Amino acid sequence: MNTPEPRLHHVTCASPVGLHRMAYWEWGDAANPRVVVCVHGLSRQGRDFDTLARDLSSDYRVICPDVVGRGRSGWLPDPRLYGVPTYVADMVTLVARLNVPEVHWVGTSMGGLIGIALAAQQGTPITRLVLNDVGPVIEPGFIPRVLGYLGVPAFWRTLEEAAEATWAISRGFGPHTLEQWQALTRHQLVPAEQDGPAGKLSGFKPHYDPAIAVPVRAAT
């Protein structure tokens, strides 16, 4: 049965330092054998695909994970494990949970790199691979640009303020309305407090573990 909103699930995954939980969002008929897995970029989360997933859900079961360290997923105790090998292992666990022999894969940026790595494995479940904003080579200017905001403490009083920050970082990805920028920002936030001149201020901070920046910084 198709639903206007996704269903949230979790799967337990293993790493060299123990177990962690990965969240994933499911759209469409859970019994549909035709599965599309949509995986987000470095600092994003699975709700980025809401519009695409909603459109596809009449024909496919659509799965949008929050890669570990992001969204509703757990955080890793060792930040050095935030990398493609961990993410690929988690996706193998996810596909096993879905109990399907094959999947179509849509990957944006980091999600595309995960898809490339998984598609290269013998016996891969990926039958079709769609890459967005990524290729086999990372451009030289990418890492310095990302480190300008990734893992940097941030606090916004309102959704509108946060959406402006999202626009400043991502405006090169094409034209969007104000409402679209807010939709792309809403699930990027978690409630937070910050000290102000008259006491605590309520607002929002990024959803992800700041330590996801550690391996990126080490690559420079």
Label the model's feature ranges:
Residues 16-18, 25, 51-54, 64-106:
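Active-site loop/oxyanion-hole signature of alpha/beta-hydrolase fold enzymes
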Residues 41-51, 62:
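Serine-hydrolase catalytic-loop signature spanning alpha/beta hydrolases and amidase-signature enzymes
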Residues 132-161:
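A catalytic-pocket lid/entrance helix-loop region that shapes and gates access to the active site
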